[in-house]
Amino acid sequence: MPRPAYRSRSLRRVKVKTPGGRTVVHYEKRAKGVPKCAVTGQPLGGMNSKVYRFGISTRAPSRPYGGVVSHKVLARAIRYAVRR
């Protein structure tokens, strides 16, 4: 029986063959997905998904709602706000 911490599915299971010929299970963190727009769901440009040790302010573009919505949605929202 695995340790209680390993019973969760938050860690993915990888079967690894050892040099002795046994097959053992290694537990790894799951890969993170690409950042997506909150409105359209399309992948965000300018967001470095590989560098997760930095904070979001370092990774995200420095514009309003950078790292949350795509540039098209932001442009549409700004146009809507100006025309109102």
UniProtKB/Swiss-Prot annotation:
Belongs to the eukaryotic ribosomal protein eL34 family. InterPro entries: Ribosomal_eL34 (IPR008195), Ribosomal_eL34_C_sf (IPR038562), Ribosomal_eL34_CS (IPR018065), Ribosomal_L34e_arc-type (IPR047868). Keywords: Ribonucleoprotein, Ribosomal protein. It comes from the Archaea. Pfam families: Ribosomal_L34e (PF01199). One of its GO terms (molecular function) is structural constituent of ribosome. It comes from Pyrobaculum calidifontis (strain DSM 21063 / JCM 11548 / VA1). GO terms for cellular component: ribonucleoprotein complex; ribosome. This is Large ribosomal subunit protein eL34. The gene is rpl34e. Transmembrane segments: none annotated. GO terms for biological process: translation. PROSITE patterns: RIBOSOMAL_L34E (PS01145).
